[in-house]
A protein has these predicted regions:
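Acidic (Asp/Glu)-rich catalytic clusters
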Residues: 7, 50-51, 87-94, 116, ...
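Active-site mouth loops of central-metabolism enzymes
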Residues: 25-40, 101-110, 196-205, 256-259, ...
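Conserved, mostly hydrophobic/aromatic
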Residues: 49, 53, 89, 119, ...
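N-terminal beta1-alpha1-beta2 module of alpha/beta enzyme domains
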Residues: 1-92, 195-198, 375-381
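Short, acidic/polar
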Residues: 36-49, 204-212, 323-334
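Hydrophobic, small-residue-rich alpha-helical packing segments that form membrane-like cores
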Residues: 108, 121, 137-162, 189
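An alpha-helical appendage that flanks or caps ligand/catalytic pockets
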Residues: 2-21, 50-51, 150-193, 225-338, ...
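Hydrophobic faces of well-ordered beta-strands that scaffold small-molecule active sites
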Residues: 13-15, 57-59, 98-100, 127-131, ...
Length: 381
């Protein structure tokens, strides 16, 4: 058995793994410099992340939506299905965790319970679940289902996770009769290695999404542009967590470029932004602003051009752009001064070189005592 991270002072560093092509910087130059999406390149990237000392890989996923301009620009689509990609990664790594996105809206609880138990057992306790409800009407249409409104999706998700956890926990058949789901019996799958259950995270920062995370998850992934935004989001989360007695931490997204020389990382970033793909960025912006509550609150007051640049450049999230020392200082501050439990790192260029560059940051974090490498500990995450 393995337990979820018991270190209250540890900062979990995840890598936003590219299941599709370029992530969160909608630049034609970034797309041009992106390697082919094939087994060799993706497995090499996963191994480089493990060698650098990352705690986890985070694989986002969706079934449909905002694809046409994105595909023309070489951005994020087509994409590999997260749980299937994870199996390949587990086969070529030993320590790094993999968090896969699985929708509550488009699965049955038994599907996720069996997939999750299999992934966790196969990996030796290295699997985590990003539980999302889905936000796209295109996805509902793809499955031939009616579109479910926002708060109802989270009410359904709470019941869904309850059923999944019962199926993981109980050796005897369960009998569950809820408002949205019914389940009777047990799954034919190995027990999860992580106890009391695998890690669960979510990324919904609306009131309903935050309440869901407080009740059912271990971490809430947040979209924040500044340390003050991270602190405010965490305070809202902790106000809901406190009555439950649970521990739920905030994991903000960050866009990151690390270079050894002063100013080199910022220069690289500016070069990428010179070829910002406005069509692809606006398609993403329109979809996000129309359906994702977190982003609507952040960008509602922006005009088209400003929203396109903010979303297309990755400036909708924290920016960690600098030397290893500079980036490490920012991460240490997020842990010590803001209370972040983790950070999800997104590189606009995905290659083993970027991960090796970030390895220097991770070593500095260990020296500062804010994290422990997964290769040297006996617990997950």
């Amino acid at each position: 058995m393995k337990s979820i991270n018991p270190d209250p002072n540890g900062l979990s560093i995840g890598y936003f793994f590219p299941a599709g092509r370029t992530n969160h910087v909608w630049s034609d130059e970034a797309a041009r410099r992106t390697p082919q999406m094939n087994r060799h390149n993706l497995m090499a990237l996963a191994q480089a992340a493990e060698d650098a000392g990352f705690d986890s890989l985070f694989i986002a996923d969706n079934w449909s939506g905002h694809q046409r301009a994105a595909e023309r620009g070489g951005h994020q689509a087509p994409a590999f299905h997260a749980p299937l990609l994870a199996m390949g990664i587990f086969a070529v790594t030993d320590h790094i965790g993999v968090i896969t996105t699985l929708h509550t809206t488009h699965h049955k609880p038994a599907h996720v319970a069996r997939m999750g138990a299999t992934l966790d057992a196969f990996s030796g306790g290295r699997w985590g679940w990003n539980a999302v409800t889905g936000h796209s009407g295109d996805e509902a249409a793809l499955f031939g289902e009616p579109y479910v409104e926002h708060d109802k999706r989270y009410a359904m998700a709470a019941e869904f996770v309850d059923v999944v956890q019962q199926l993981w926990r109980e050796e005897e058949p369960i009998e569950f009769v809820g408002k949205f789901y019914r389940a009777q019996g047990r799954i034919k799958a190995p027990r999860p290695v992580q106890q009391p259950r695998p890690l669960i995270v979510s990324a919904g920062a609306s009131p309903a999404g935050t309440a869901f995370a407080a009740d059912w998850c271990d971490a809430l992934v947040t979209l924040a542009r500044t340390e003050a935004d991270v602190r405010a989001a965490d305070e809202r989360l902790q106000a809901l967590v406190a009555p439950t007695g649970r521990t739920v931490t905030s994991w903000p997204f960050a866009i990151c470029i690390v270079r050894d020389g002063e100013g080199e990382a910022q220069e690289e970033y500016e070069q990428l932004l010179k070829s910002l793909n406005a069509d692809a960025a606006w398609e993403i912006a329109s979809d996000i602003l129309g359906s994702i509550e977190t982003a609507k609150a952040m960008f509602d007051k922006l005009g088209r051009d400003e929203a396109v640049r903010a979303i297309g450049s990755g400036s909708a999230m924290l920016q960690l752009i600098g030397t290893p020392d500079q980036v490490a200082e920012q991460l240490i501050s997020l842990r010590r001064n803001v209370g972040a439990g983790g950070v999800l790192i997104n590189f606009p260029l995905w290659s083993p070189r970027e991960l090796r560059n970030f390895g220097g940051v991770l070593r500095r974090l260990e020296e500062a005592g804010v994290r422990t490498s997964p290769a040297s500990r006996n617990y997950s995450w």
